[in-house]
Regions:
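Positively charged N-terminal leader segments that act as targeting/secretion signals
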Residues: 9, 30-41
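Internal helix-turn-beta structural module
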Residues: 351-394
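Conserved, mostly hydrophobic/aromatic
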Residues: 106, 311, 377
């Protein structure tokens, strides 16, 4: 350690002078002298220590606390009722108390809130038409897990330009969910991180944990505390065991780190979620057919779980070709019509217009068409919902006469 004069940091405060008697009184001459230079302490060893914290962080911005966003977009009585009733319906479907089919249908991801609202209004008519046979929930995905890189969703980059206005994205997401649920349409979404649920989860009727995160301990812990039913997808390679393990893990209490509505770091303790299930989404090969359903149910039995399966018509089951969702859904409908009660739900990627488009700077986007995975168009979507509703009716007849 060394002492330097005039150094700019690490200064020791000068001790206060004590006046105890005549001998300590300064003369006028002494008082006119310039003050002694202040002495500064400098830890040379510490100054030479390498920097090990935040070395790859370019910038840290403040995140608006969840409570602020919740006050801006208050959950209305109508939105709360719609969300609650759909959660209850899904609970009954999962526990074999309702023979309807849960259908999660909508765009691969939301990038245009206006198109999303138009889709929601059109879907609402079909939800009402098929209410006796289907519990239709709109797929409203704001976050996109990426295998490598790419646009990560409306919350992460709402302006689609790499500006990453996340505070804006969170507000847009909550506002859209509120608008959708207020017209009577329950919403489903994927939960990708530990913080964003505090901004939107009260408006979500059903949640998903994706294939890339099903094996993640933190996502299993999150699911154990979510207020909505949650589906776990099988792994990207088709591994079913990790999904059934996730369902078991999420059914138990957990303690983990998250944030409060006020935005403070917190320890969260959960009760466990009894409304979790597996989603067959394909992998190296599809797994939507009857043989795959049988295999999944054997895996469920090995895990001491009831076999209640949702089948994703897209992703690995469509081999990434959106038009393949139609034959996949017809195969699933045939299984249902033959009386298979183990299939409790399906997922469909659907938009106003079929296909997909690339996000190209400076190039206008086609309204109502996906910028992530390809989707089937509106007419095909409506047809598939009708066929699924007919399959549920047929299943009832088969089971009633069995």
């Amino acid at each position: 350690h060394i002492f330097l004069q005039g150094f700019t940091f690490g200064a020791f405060p000068q001790p206060a002078e004590r006046v105890t008697g005549p001998d300590t009184l300064k003369s006028t001459e002494d008082s006119n002298k310039p003050p002694e230079p202040r002495r500064f302490f400098f830890d040379l060893e510490r100054a030479m220590q390498p920097i090990t914290d935040d070395v790859r962080i370019r910038e840290i911005k403040e995140l608006t606390p969840p409570s602020h966003v919740l006050r801006e977009f208050v959950c209305s009585e109508r939105a709360a009722q719609v969300t609650y009733e759909s959660r209850q319906a899904i609970h009954r479907i999962l526990h074999d108390m309702d023979d309807r089919l849960l259908v999660i249908i909508g765009p691969c991801s939301i990038h245009d809130t206006k198109a999303a609202m138009q889709y929601a209004k059109q879907l609402m008519g079909l939800r009402e038409r098929y209410a006796q046979d289907l519990e239709i929930v709109m797929r409203v995905y704001f976050e996109k897990p990426r295998t490598t890189i790419g646009w990560k969703g409306l919350i992460n980059d709402p302006d689609l330009d790499g500006s990453f206005q996340i505070n804006k994205g969170l507000r847009l997401a909550r506002e859209l969910l509120l608008n959708i649920t207020e017209i009577g349409m329950p919403a489903g979404t994927e939960f990708l991180d530990m913080i964003s649920p505090q901004y939107i989860a009260d408006l979500v009727a059903w949640g998903a944990i994706g294939a890339r995160t099903t094996e993640s301990q933190s996502h299993r812990e999150l699911a154990s505390g979510l207020s909505c039913p949650v589906g776990f997808k099988n792994g990207t390679d088709g591994n079913l065991r990790i999904a059934f393990d996730a369902v078991k893990a999420a059914s138990h209490p957990h303690h983990f780190l998250s944030v409060t509505k006020g935005g403070h770091s917190a320890i969260v303790s959960t009760n466990g979620n009894e409304d979790c299930h597996v989603i067959l989404r394909g992998g190296k090969t599809p797994n939507y057919d009857a043989a795959s359903v049988d295999a999944a149910c054997k895996e469920a039995a090995n895990a001491a779980l009831a076999c209640r399966l949702m089948i994703d018509a897209s992703h690995g089951n469509s081999q990434k070709k959106p038009e393949n969702q139609i034959p996949v859904l017809r195969n699933i409908a045939a299984q249902i019509a033959e009386g298979d009660a183990r299939i409790m739900g399906v997922m469909i990627e659907s938009h106003l217009h079929a296909g997909r488009q690339d996000l190209v700077p400076g190039k206008p986007l086609t309204y109502g068409q996906s910028i992530t995975d390809g989707c089937i168009g509106w007419d095909d979507s409506a047809q598939m919902l009708q066929e699924l509703a007919d399959a549920v009716k047929a299943r009832r007849l088969v089971l009633e006469t069995a």
